Amino acid sequence: MQKQVVVMDEAAIKRALTRVSYEIIERNKGTKNLALVGIKTRGIYLAERLHKRILEIEGIDVPVGDIDITLYRDDLSFKDDKTREPAVHGTNIPFDINGKKVVLVDDVLYTGRTVRAAMDALMDVGRPAQIHLAVLADRGHRELPIRADYVGKNIPTSGNERVEVRLTDVDNEEDAVIINKNE
Protein backbone atom coordinates (compact mmCIF):
# COMPACT_ATOMS: atom_id res chain seq x y z
CA MET A 1 0.00 0.00 0.00
CA GLN A 2 1.27 3.46 -0.88
CA LYS A 3 0.70 6.49 1.34
CA GLN A 4 1.13 10.06 0.10
CA VAL A 5 2.14 12.93 2.37
CA VAL A 6 2.15 16.51 1.07
CA VAL A 7 5.24 18.24 2.51
CA MET A 8 4.98 21.46 0.47
CA ASP A 9 1.82 22.97 -0.95
CA GLU A 10 1.56 25.69 -3.59
CA ALA A 11 2.08 28.53 -1.08
CA ALA A 12 5.12 26.82 0.49
CA ILE A 13 6.68 26.27 -2.95
CA LYS A 14 6.12 29.92 -3.86
CA ARG A 15 7.71 31.09 -0.58
CA ALA A 16 10.68 28.73 -1.02
CA LEU A 17 11.32 29.93 -4.59
CA THR A 18 11.11 33.56 -3.47
CA ARG A 19 13.65 32.89 -0.70
CA VAL A 20 15.95 31.01 -3.10
CA SER A 21 15.73 33.94 -5.55
CA TYR A 22 16.89 36.35 -2.85
CA GLU A 23 19.68 33.95 -1.85
CA ILE A 24 20.88 33.72 -5.46
CA ILE A 25 20.93 37.52 -5.79
CA GLU A 26 22.69 37.98 -2.44
CA ARG A 27 25.34 35.31 -2.96
CA ASN A 28 26.16 36.60 -6.45
CA LYS A 29 26.11 40.26 -5.33
CA GLY A 30 23.41 41.05 -7.86
CA THR A 31 22.66 39.59 -11.26
CA LYS A 32 25.72 40.55 -13.31
CA ASN A 33 26.90 37.59 -15.45
CA LEU A 34 24.19 35.40 -13.91
CA ALA A 35 22.29 32.78 -15.92
CA LEU A 36 19.76 30.09 -15.01
CA VAL A 37 19.70 26.66 -16.66
CA GLY A 38 16.88 24.24 -15.86
CA ILE A 39 17.42 20.49 -16.02
CA LYS A 40 14.65 18.82 -18.01
CA THR A 41 11.83 18.42 -17.17
CA ARG A 42 10.67 20.12 -13.98
CA GLY A 43 13.91 22.06 -13.51
CA ILE A 44 12.99 24.08 -16.60
CA TYR A 45 9.76 25.31 -15.05
CA LEU A 46 11.41 26.02 -11.72
CA ALA A 47 14.16 28.01 -13.52
CA GLU A 48 11.45 30.05 -15.26
CA ARG A 49 9.81 30.77 -11.90
CA LEU A 50 13.14 31.83 -10.38
CA HIS A 51 13.73 34.03 -13.44
CA LYS A 52 10.36 35.70 -12.92
CA ARG A 53 11.05 36.34 -9.21
CA ILE A 54 14.55 37.72 -9.89
CA LEU A 55 13.06 40.02 -12.53
CA GLU A 56 10.45 41.23 -10.01
CA ILE A 57 13.10 41.79 -7.31
CA GLU A 58 15.97 43.28 -9.34
CA GLY A 59 14.30 44.46 -12.54
CA ILE A 60 16.95 42.55 -14.52
CA ASP A 61 16.11 39.96 -17.17
CA VAL A 62 18.53 37.13 -16.37
CA PRO A 63 19.03 34.69 -19.29
CA VAL A 64 17.34 31.30 -18.91
CA GLY A 65 18.03 28.08 -20.77
CA ASP A 66 17.38 24.39 -20.41
CA ILE A 67 19.56 21.34 -20.68
CA ASP A 68 18.80 17.76 -21.69
CA ILE A 69 21.07 15.30 -19.90
CA THR A 70 19.81 12.13 -21.60
CA LEU A 71 23.09 11.28 -23.35
CA TYR A 72 25.15 12.09 -20.24
CA ARG A 73 23.38 9.78 -17.79
CA ASP A 74 25.05 6.66 -16.47
CA ASP A 75 21.65 4.94 -16.49
CA LEU A 76 20.69 5.85 -20.06
CA SER A 77 17.10 4.92 -20.91
CA PHE A 78 15.86 4.20 -24.40
CA LYS A 79 12.58 5.13 -26.08
CA ASP A 80 12.67 1.83 -27.97
CA ASP A 81 14.56 -1.18 -26.60
CA LYS A 82 14.74 -2.77 -30.08
CA THR A 83 16.54 0.10 -31.81
CA ARG A 84 18.34 1.21 -28.62
CA GLU A 85 17.70 4.85 -29.50
CA PRO A 86 17.71 7.19 -26.50
CA ALA A 87 14.80 9.59 -26.02
CA VAL A 88 16.61 12.91 -26.61
CA HIS A 89 14.72 16.18 -26.17
CA GLY A 90 17.42 18.73 -26.94
CA THR A 91 19.19 21.50 -25.09
CA ASN A 92 18.17 25.13 -25.46
CA ILE A 93 20.73 27.60 -24.15
CA PRO A 94 20.30 30.68 -26.37
CA PHE A 95 23.16 32.63 -24.77
CA ASP A 96 26.90 32.29 -24.28
CA ILE A 97 27.66 30.59 -20.94
CA ASN A 98 31.42 31.28 -21.12
CA GLY A 99 32.42 33.32 -18.08
CA LYS A 100 28.89 33.30 -16.64
CA LYS A 101 27.78 32.30 -13.15
CA VAL A 102 25.37 29.52 -14.07
CA VAL A 103 22.76 28.29 -11.62
CA LEU A 104 21.62 24.78 -12.53
CA VAL A 105 18.03 24.26 -11.39
CA ASP A 106 16.34 20.94 -10.64
CA ASP A 107 13.33 19.75 -8.69
CA VAL A 108 14.78 17.04 -6.42
CA LEU A 109 18.37 16.32 -5.41
CA TYR A 110 18.82 12.65 -4.55
CA THR A 111 21.90 10.61 -5.53
CA GLY A 112 23.65 13.46 -7.37
CA ARG A 113 23.85 11.53 -10.64
CA THR A 114 21.47 13.87 -12.49
CA VAL A 115 23.50 16.90 -11.43
CA ARG A 116 26.78 15.24 -12.46
CA ALA A 117 25.29 14.54 -15.89
CA ALA A 118 24.02 18.14 -16.13
CA MET A 119 27.47 19.54 -15.32
CA ASP A 120 29.04 17.33 -18.00
CA ALA A 121 26.44 18.48 -20.53
CA LEU A 122 26.94 22.13 -19.53
CA MET A 123 30.72 21.89 -19.96
CA ASP A 124 30.16 20.65 -23.51
CA VAL A 125 28.24 23.89 -24.21
CA GLY A 126 30.89 26.22 -22.80
CA ARG A 127 33.03 27.12 -19.81
CA PRO A 128 31.10 28.97 -17.13
CA ALA A 129 33.01 30.91 -14.46
CA GLN A 130 30.97 29.16 -11.75
CA ILE A 131 28.26 26.53 -11.51
CA HIS A 132 25.86 26.64 -8.59
CA LEU A 133 22.96 24.29 -7.90
CA ALA A 134 19.43 25.24 -6.86
CA VAL A 135 16.87 22.56 -5.99
CA LEU A 136 13.34 22.71 -4.68
CA ALA A 137 13.81 19.60 -2.51
CA ASP A 138 16.92 17.87 -1.17
CA ARG A 139 16.09 14.37 0.05
CA GLY A 140 19.61 13.21 0.92
CA HIS A 141 21.04 9.75 0.08
CA ARG A 142 23.91 11.08 -2.05
CA GLU A 143 26.04 8.64 -4.05
CA LEU A 144 28.31 11.38 -5.40
CA PRO A 145 29.97 14.31 -3.59
CA ILE A 146 27.42 16.90 -4.71
CA ARG A 147 25.71 19.53 -2.56
CA ALA A 148 23.08 22.10 -3.47
CA ASP A 149 23.96 25.77 -2.98
CA TYR A 150 20.30 26.79 -2.75
CA VAL A 151 17.62 24.50 -1.28
CA GLY A 152 13.90 25.15 -1.09
CA LYS A 153 13.39 22.46 1.56
CA ASN A 154 15.45 19.64 3.03
CA ILE A 155 13.27 16.53 3.15
CA PRO A 156 14.92 13.63 4.97
CA THR A 157 13.62 10.34 3.55
CA SER A 158 14.12 6.63 3.94
CA GLY A 159 15.03 4.22 1.16
CA ASN A 160 11.43 3.10 0.61
CA GLU A 161 10.16 6.66 0.13
CA ARG A 162 10.05 8.68 -3.06
CA VAL A 163 9.81 12.46 -3.39
CA GLU A 164 7.60 13.69 -6.20
CA VAL A 165 7.25 17.29 -7.37
CA ARG A 166 4.03 18.24 -9.12
CA LEU A 167 3.86 21.49 -11.03
CA THR A 168 0.81 23.00 -12.66
CA ASP A 169 2.87 23.80 -15.78
CA VAL A 170 3.69 20.11 -16.41
CA ASP A 171 1.28 17.93 -14.51
CA ASN A 172 -1.94 19.95 -14.76
CA GLU A 173 -2.24 19.52 -10.99
CA GLU A 174 -1.80 21.97 -8.14
CA ASP A 175 1.83 22.61 -7.18
CA ALA A 176 2.96 20.22 -4.46
CA VAL A 177 5.92 18.27 -3.13
CA ILE A 178 4.79 14.83 -2.04
CA ILE A 179 6.48 11.94 -0.27
CA ASN A 180 5.22 8.57 -1.49
CA LYS A 181 5.70 5.95 1.22
CA ASN A 182 5.50 2.23 0.52
CA GLU A 183 3.97 0.53 3.53
UniProtKB/Swiss-Prot annotation:
Superkingdom to which the source organism belongs: Bacteria
Short motif PRPP-binding, span: 102-114
Classification via Pfam families: Pribosyltran
Gene3D superfamilies in alphabetical order: 3.40.50.2020
Keyword annotations: Glycosyltransferase, RNA-binding, Transcription, Transcription regulation, Transcription termination, Transferase
One Gene Ontology term of the molecular function aspect: uracil phosphoribosyltransferase activity
Listed InterPro entries: PRibTrfase_dom (IPR000836), PRTase-like (IPR029057), PyrR (IPR023050), PyrR_bifunctional (IPR050137)
Positions of substrate binding: T41, R42, D106, D107, V108, L109, Y110, T111, G112, R113, T114, R139, V163
Catalytic activity: UMP + diphosphate = 5-phospho-alpha-D-ribose 1-diphosphate + uracil
Enzyme Commission code: 2.4.2.9
A single BP term in Gene Ontology: DNA-templated transcription termination
Function (record text): Regulates transcriptional attenuation of the pyrimidine nucleotide (pyr) operon by binding in a uridine-dependent manner to specific sites on pyr mRNA. This disrupts an antiterminator hairpin in the RNA and favors formation of a downstream transcription terminator, leading to a reduced expression of downstream genes. Also displays a weak uracil phosphoribosyltransferase activity which is not physiologically significant.
Family to which the UniProt record says this protein belongs: Belongs to the purine/pyrimidine phosphoribosyltransferase family. PyrR subfamily.
NCBIfam families, per the entry: PRK05205.1-1, PRK05205.1-4, PRK05205.1-5
Quaternary structure and partners: Homodimer and homohexamer; in equilibrium.
Name this polypeptide is given: Bifunctional protein PyrR
Native source species: Listeria monocytogenes serotype 4b (strain F2365)
Organism placement in taxonomy: Bacteria, Bacillati, Bacillota, Bacilli, Bacillales
